[in-house]
Amino acid sequence: MAVDLHYEMVCEYYGYILLRTGMEDCAMHPDLSHLLPTSGSTGSPKLVRHKYGNIEAAALNISTFFGLTSNDRPLLVLPLYYTMGLSVVFSHLYVGATVLITNQSMTDKAFWIFMKEQHATSFTGVPYSFEILNLMRFFRMDLPDLTLLTQGGGKMPRQLNLKFAEYCRDNGKRWIATYGQSEGTARMAYLPPEYAISKCGSIGRAVPNAELSLIDSDGSVIELPNTEGEMCYRGKNVTMGYARKREDLLLGDERNGFMRTGDLAYRDEDGCYFIVGRMGRFLKLYGMRIGLDECEQIINCLLYTSDAADDLIGV
């Protein structure tokens, strides 16, 4: 790893290096507990300002809807600087569970030996994680201790989502798709496992002790089902705001427990939410509104069926 020689290296651990910069201490707001990086919807890097109480609230919410107990043994494959990876740790420590951590890659044999020997009971991944599992013939593996698979970090192709949902249904395991943002201390919604197949693609409902809603372009709350609007979230796990420069660390809570997610969604008759795309990610061609996110989803679905993929490549 390249190191700026202008700074003194204090220590190096697990690939991370702590440097002594000599910079003056930075004044911070008393409610600020920690910072996590995020790129947000625009891709511009910034830090999310968490306050004291965010993690505790999120831990309670997550452990409740997953039904976590001290007997759980989750296997952590996501980095701790990533909000969902961190949520795996704090939600399980909240109930006194053991978190299994390894630096082995999912493609290494040692990873699976560790998983079996340590009797891992759950696995949390992003769509890419499950694409790897699919290529590794995960469905043929004998993993009797594994009872829960959870997914977040983006929308999975429908066919892959269904494949894991059906596998879990047929093998006495639970498949729970979740939705969240760094700004909401990770998980903000989840799809109950009984809906994993019938409502595949939905993010489900708000986590316990929180609330989802939809608003129109005027900011009015949408009550009717199957009507698109911007999805909003209210809960104690909502963070304070962003930090783009040192001075921002002095800022107070700019959200007060409420945030507009920037996602365009609708709610069905059962109260389950479906995300259509990001606000603003639309083109207007010949008077018709075309969602870029929906186009990406269609292409992803096509690429998961060989015949359709051949047709797509031939276009």
Predicted features by range, described:
Residues 123, 235, 240-241, 262-307:
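AMP-binding/adenylate-forming catalytic core of the ANL superfamily
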Residues 32-60, 311:
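Conserved AMP-binding A3 loop
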Residues 56-73, 83-122, 207:
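Conserved AMP-binding/adenylation subdomain of ANL enzymes
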Residues 20-37, 44, 67-73:
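Conserved pre-ATP/AMP-binding loop-to-beta segment of ANL
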Residues 1-28:
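Structural core segment of the AMP-binding/adenylate-forming
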Residues 308-310, 314-315:
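Positively charged, low-complexity/disordered segments
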Residues 120-125, 134-198, 211:
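Gly/Ser/Thr-rich phosphate-binding loop
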Residues 205-209, 220-252, 288-290:
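Conserved ATP/PPi-binding loop(s) of AMP-dependent carboxylate-activating enzymes
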